[in-house]
């Protein structure tokens, strides 16, 4: 029996899971999950996610724990609906050295959250350093996105100008996000929301086909009807359009914390250390949120706590649920 089959069998007969799903129906519920040890949280949470649907953000204590949790959900759920939301910086936001892979994973997650249809589920695994960073708000993400579909009447010159305006760099062959190339009637472009670039074939001023392709072999992997090309949101979005990820995801999202108090203290520590290292401290609010701001943005959401150590004015008294 596979892990998913075991999960389905468990979900069908568990009274405790039924209680958990009933609590989930309360939009602003705060629930303390008692007596969960080892991998039990992953199992119960995956069952609740599959049964209840919606957007679920799991906040582990560090990057490694978040990655392990993601792997658990890969085995228990549809891995296409499980996303990793890491930090976009190699060291600290103060030094401005981006981690390209982290930026792509963050952008892909934001794109998935923004386009969540309301049916099914979406799981996000993250940790304090990533949650502390501000992101482009939904309006800015929409504004910066270049949408192209098969059959669109658009010239290569117009598309290229849009890519230049979005700070994409022209190269001979694309190999990393933020690049594009033009060869005859073909435009290759590497969006910050994808692990593979797109190849757009033009017939005159009409988009004839869109495909993903492998960088090394140059072979197409799949055909697409429509794509959304997203630039580096860290570079192109003004401070006034930056919000916490909790605000971006909205009050409908649910949050699962291994140790909420640790996460909030860590967010404040990151902000304080970054502030002391910054050459222009007045820019801190464009980079990082604060403990109090994050709490305020979480106040209308469902919160599930593995440890009942979050006694704060912004969050309701937790319901105790023994599993």
Briefly describe each language-model feature range.
Residues 1-312, 316, 320-323:
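ASCE RecA-like P-loop NTPase motor cores
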């Amino acid at each position: 029996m596979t892990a998913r089959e075991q999960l389905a069998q468990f979900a069908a007969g568990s009274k405790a899971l039924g209680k958990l799903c009933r609590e989930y129906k309360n939009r602003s519920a705060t629930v303390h999950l008692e007596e969960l040890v080892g991998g039990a949280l992953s199992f119960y949470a995956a069952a609740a996610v599959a049964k209840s649907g919606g957007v679920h953000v799991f906040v582990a204590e560090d990057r490694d724990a978040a990655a392990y949790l993601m792997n658990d959900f890969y085995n228990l759920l549809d891995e296409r609906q499980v996303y990793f939301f890491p930090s976009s910086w190699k060291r600290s936001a103060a030094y401005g050295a981006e981690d390209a892979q982290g930026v792509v994973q963050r952008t892909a997650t934001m794109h998935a959250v923004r386009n969540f249809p309301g049916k099914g589920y979406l799981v996000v695994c993250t940790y304090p350093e990533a949650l502390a960073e501000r992101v482009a708000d939904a309006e800015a993400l929409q504004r910066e996105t270049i949408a192209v579909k098969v059959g669109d009447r658009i010239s290569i010159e117009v598309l290229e100008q849009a890519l230049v305006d979005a700070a994409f760099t022209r190269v001979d062959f694309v190999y990393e996000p933020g690049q594009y190339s033009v060869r005859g009637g073909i435009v290759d472009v590497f969006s910050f929301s994808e692990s593979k670039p797109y190849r757009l074939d033009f017939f005159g001023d009409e988009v004839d086909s869109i495909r993903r392709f492998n960088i090394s072999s140059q072979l197409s992997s799949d055909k697409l009807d429509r794509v959304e090309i997203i630039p580096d949101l860290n570079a192109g979005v003004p401070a006034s359009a930056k919000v916490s990820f909790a605000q971006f995801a909205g009050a409908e999202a649910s949050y699962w914390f291994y140790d909420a108090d640790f996460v909030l203290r860590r967010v404040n520590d990151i902000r304080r250390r970054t502030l002391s290292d910054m050459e222009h401290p007045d820019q801190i609010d464009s980079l990082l949120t604060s403990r109090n701001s994050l709490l305020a943005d979480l106040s209308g959401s469902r919160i599930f706590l593995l440890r009942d150590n979050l006694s704060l004015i912004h969050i309701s008294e937790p319901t105790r649920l023994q599993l």
